[in-house]
Amino acid sequence: MPLDEFEFSVLKTIQTHHLIFPGHKVLVALSGGMDSMSLLNILLKLRQKLNCEIFAAHLNHMIRENAIRDEQFVYSYCKKAGVKIFVERFDVPKFCADRKIGIEEGARAARYTFLNRIAHENGIDLIALAHNLNDLVETILYRIVRGTGLSGIVCMKLKDENKIRPLLYFKREQIEAYIKRNNIPYVQDETNFNLKYSRNYIRHRIVPALKLLNSDLENAFSQVHFSGMMLENHVKRLIKKYSERIFRCGKRIIFDSKDMDEFEIIELVKYCAGQMNVDLNYRQIQLVVSKLNENSWSIDLSEDIAIKKGFDFFSIEKKCKFMNILKVGKPGVYKFNDWTFELSSEVKSNEYVFIHDQGGVCIRKRKAGEKIAGVKMKDMMIDSKIPAFLRDEMPVVCTIDRIIWVPYVYVDRCFKERKEDSLVLNLLQNPYSCILELRKDERRKMV
């Protein structure tokens, strides 16, 4: 059977954007509504051309009285069409009540969890979602009203990991015409007209009002969406460009912002925060922007995550307690917070000191106002380009009466030369070597 104009356009979208490849298994998220029923029928008609296999999945959210009707409808339809369908029930109202979240948010989370699990368990490559251009408009408006950044504008994509949206750039009226023209049955979700749901209010109140200003609202928003995607792609290239300047150091992610502009710094801050599972809000971003020209500072992002700046370095880190002091005695390995030392008879690293008398040697944190040879340790760390957020974690190696070594900052000359019975305290592992080595040529090694 030849393709009609709409089906051909969907095929071209799939081929142009490489949504489905030969041999792929595709799972259609089938609610039974107009959009998902049209998507299922189009993919069934295209499956031979695409050389793919089509499945369907339906989750009964147990929210509406007619949910059983919808479940039975999609099951019966797929059985007649020869399509394998996966059907499950999930008590979304209880799920939302237990987690104190809204019905819309909870239903979406439950649905995606279900779809991903079905795909994984059955070796299915792609999940096909029936979002259309009107859905895109409504979602962007919803995100803007809630307060969003770039990610909110590019909230839906034609392809997003294992999810595809072949109908994303088609208007709802095109889908309605296709359904009517082909006599495709569907069920109507009566809650789509309930204005207590935010998306319905946007659909039935906000969008019609905006169309009085621009009758071609959908295409206007698709242009905004396209621009957002171009900017997002630029940010991805930016992250790749500076990937060698981003370091994961224990419970920190640190990046070197030297010679970066404000836009680049903020995008890297957002990226690194995201790697720590923190989504920066507008207020936090504005606060970071306001402090960019300051040399050192700290901002709490959550109860256990903070962002700190020292010189050109930014650190997004988990808050944690650190060891204050560690005694060094017999030869062996010593761990001081994230630093690893070894006391042995041999030089085993580039960073080391000779220990002439093992008695009374310890590794500790610096003390407030502490001086070495009359110079404040803080000033020495500043001269050595140690970022402020690392200074309290720098190990200070002491004997009973003097500081003999602060790695990357100071070494007492008397402990740089071996004596007859000396042992060697080697720095084996330094979690911040990637940062400290960057400015090594600028450091003052001895006093």
From Swiss-Prot:
Location within or outside the cell: Cytoplasm
Entry's family note: Belongs to the tRNA(Ile)-lysidine synthase family.
Cellular component GO terms held in the UniProt record: cytoplasm
Entry's EC annotation: 6.3.4.19
InterPro entries (alphabetical): Lysidine-tRNA-synth_C (IPR012796), Rossmann-like_a/b/a_fold (IPR014729), TilS/TtcA_N (IPR011063), tRNA_Ile_lys_synt (IPR012094), tRNA_Ile_lys_synt_N (IPR012795)
Protein's recorded name: tRNA(Ile)-lysidine synthase
Reaction(s) the record says it catalyses: cytidine(34) in tRNA(Ile2) + L-lysine + ATP = lysidine(34) in tRNA(Ile2) + AMP + diphosphate + H(+)
Entry's Gene Ontology BP terms: tRNA modification
Binding site for ATP: 31-36
Predominant subcellular localization, coarse grouping: cytoplasm
UniProtKB keywords: ATP-binding, Cytoplasm, Ligase, Nucleotide-binding, tRNA processing
UniProt note: domains: The N-terminal region contains the highly conserved SGGXDS motif, predicted to be a P-loop motif involved in ATP binding.
Top-level enzyme category: ligase
Annotated function: Ligates lysine onto the cytidine present at position 34 of the AUA codon-specific tRNA(Ile) that contains the anticodon CAU, in an ATP-dependent manner. Cytidine is converted to lysidine, thus changing the amino acid specificity of the tRNA from methionine to isoleucine.
Native organism: Pseudothermotoga lettingae (strain ATCC BAA-301 / DSM 14385 / NBRC 107922 / TMO)
Coiled coil: none
Molecular-function annotations in GO: ATP binding; tRNA(Ile)-lysidine synthase activity
